Amino acid sequence: MRRASLMRITGLMSLVLVMAGPADVSAVSATDDGRVQGKADAPLTLIEYSDFTCGYCMKFFKETLPKLQATYIETGKVRFVYRDYPRADRGVGVEAAVAARCAGAQGRYWAMHDRLFGEGRRLDSGSFKSAAKSLGLDQTEFGKCFDERRHLESIFQDRREANRWGFHGTPGFILMQTVAGPTEKVPAVAIPGAFPFEAFAEEIDRMLSKLPGS
């Protein structure tokens, strides 16, 4: 189980600094497949736990993620990982997560992710299959993957992992060292909500400054 060292109040948000996370949580796991952006050797990893039906998650996608990509992810400083946190056990949120995973099985996870969070989106079984067609996916394989609800266990595993970090809503974020993970000197930072870019930048810059050789 995790140990929180302290709560830090900043001008923008309250943060929990986490010395050690759940034992089975890593910066990137084998089940992340194509749900990772950025360089493998980026010193920091930012994990998002999210639901495609969550309004605040969409706010992060539209307003904050593009700035993080330009400033930290594309420059090799941060690796970004998307993990699922469906807020219900069934329904459109779960179906959307399955659709994205099925697209990921054909190498188009981020294309589907962006479509699901995009303008004019519809979230229902028919729209997921239409999106798959427009993305050029193998329709037979996608339909079979979606109808069989493949990847469900991995999706709910992500949610259980988020709960063990202390999250019980979306979105939630964990910022941590990519290789070493949380340590006493450089604890992980739990960011509970869709805060503005400046809040993420403050924590990323602070953690980067603590790394060896910085």
Label every model-predicted segment:
Residues 1-12:
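Bacterial N-terminal signal peptides that target proteins for export
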Residues 5, 63, 130-214:
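C-terminal cap of thioredoxin/glutaredoxin-like
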Residues 10-21:
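Bacterial N-terminal signal peptides
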Residues 20-30:
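Boundary at the C-terminal end of the N-terminal hydrophobic targeting segment
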Residues 28-44, 72:
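A short beta-strand-turn-helix
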Residues 42, 50-133, 138, 206-211:
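Structural alpha/beta surface segment adjacent to cysteine/selenocysteine redox centers
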Residues 45-48, 79-82, 172-174, 190:
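Soluble periplasmic/extracytoplasmic beta-strand elements of cell-envelope proteins
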Residues 47-52, 185:
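Acidic/histidine-rich, surface-exposed loop or edge segments in extracytoplasmic proteins
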